Amino acid sequence: MDLYNEINSLCIELEHSIKSLHENGVNYAEAYKNYRVLLSKELLRLKTNGMPVTIAYDIARGRKEVADAKFEELSTEAIYKANLENINALKLRIKVLENQYDKEWGNTNGW
């Protein structure tokens, strides 16, 4: 029954990871939105002040507030993607243990 308990434990962990995916996704979307808004405002300001369009984008991205927002976006994206990878790894571990459980207990019908 150790396999059964381990499978149940992983299923619970998977449920928690799926629930946290929503929160991480919202955080990522919010960080992306904030970055895009700051970048747009800075580009508009630079264009209004006569900055050539060819370099305005690079200058805008170099402004501290915009760069900080981009850092936040990239950080939350990394957390979101790591959460997705964790979910996939948990699903794979569960599947491997289910197959092992089926072999040991002779269950050919699956769960």
Residue ranges and their predicted role:
Residues M1-W111:
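Charge-rich amphipathic alpha-helical interaction elements
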